[in-house]
Structures are given as structure tokens and as C-alpha cells.
Amino acid sequence: MALSIKHPEADRLARELAARTGETLTEAVVMALRERLARTVGRTQVVPLREELAAIRRRCAALPVLDDRTAESILGYDDRGLPS
């Protein structure tokens, strides 16, 4: 299977890494990918999910209040929790 990356910086970085390590271009890319994958092992969706939820909280907190009534009042319940 062939991998064709047409990105000048990717090419430059791969060549620089290969030159520093004495590896072929393919070896340098494979090793870099293996090392990156090894660093991500054990990571779960917790970190991205936490960041996503924090962003949602920030967006919700920034929303204007359009109705000053309490949630119970909006839903139609009285102070005893019964429909009013």
C-alpha cells in the first residue's frame, strides 16, 4: 500500500528526521508514526470529551436569559411539585 503525502513541511520534516537518525525516509516515517501511536495508547475519550463539555458549558453560560421564570414555573408546577 502506498502513502503519498504532498505537503512541503511533511517532506522537510521527514527528510530532516531521516538525516539526523541515519534511517531511510520510510524508516523514519514508520518509526515516527509508531512512537506517536505509542504515546496515544491508554488515552481515552475522557480528555476530548471533557474539553468538548467545557466548550458547551461556556457557550451555554454565554446565552442570554430570555425568561426570568423558574424552571418549575415554566414547566407548570407549583411549590408542592403538583401541576398548577
Curated annotation (Swiss-Prot):
Highest rank taxon of the organism: Bacteria
Name of the gene encoding the protein in the UniProt record: vapB
Keywords assigned by UniProt, alphabetized: DNA-binding, Repressor, Toxin-antitoxin system, Transcription, Transcription regulation
Record has Transcription as a keyword: yes
Quaternary context: Forms a complex with cognate toxin VapC.
Biological role: Antitoxin component of a type II toxin-antitoxin (TA) system. Upon overexpression neutralizes the effect of overexpressed cognate toxin VapC. Overexpression alone prevents cells from entering a nonculturable dormant state, probably as it binds endogenous VapC. The TA system acts as a post-transcriptional regulator of carbon metabolism; in M.smegmatis 3 TA systems (VapB-VapC, MazE-MazF and Phd-Doc) may be involved in monitoring the nutritional supply and physiological state of the cell, linking catabolic with anabolic reactions. Translation of vapC mRNA requires VapB.
UniProt source species: Mycolicibacterium smegmatis (strain ATCC 700084 / mc(2)155) (Mycobacterium smegmatis)
Induction of the gene: Expression is low but constitutive, and repressed by VapB-VapC. Member of the vapB-vapC operon.
Recorded GO MF terms: DNA binding
Phenotype seen when the gene is deleted: The vapB-vapC operon is not essential; cells grow faster than wild-type on rich and minimal glycerol-containing medium. The operon deletion mutants die faster than wild-type under potassium-limiting conditions, which is prevented by overexpression of vapB. The vapB antitoxin gene can be disrupted without causing death, however despite elevated vapC transcription, no VapC protein could be detected, suggesting that RNA processing and translational coupling are important in VapC expression.
One Pfam family recorded for the sequence: PSK_trans_fac
Transcription regulation as UniProt keyword: yes
Protein name, per record: Antitoxin VapB
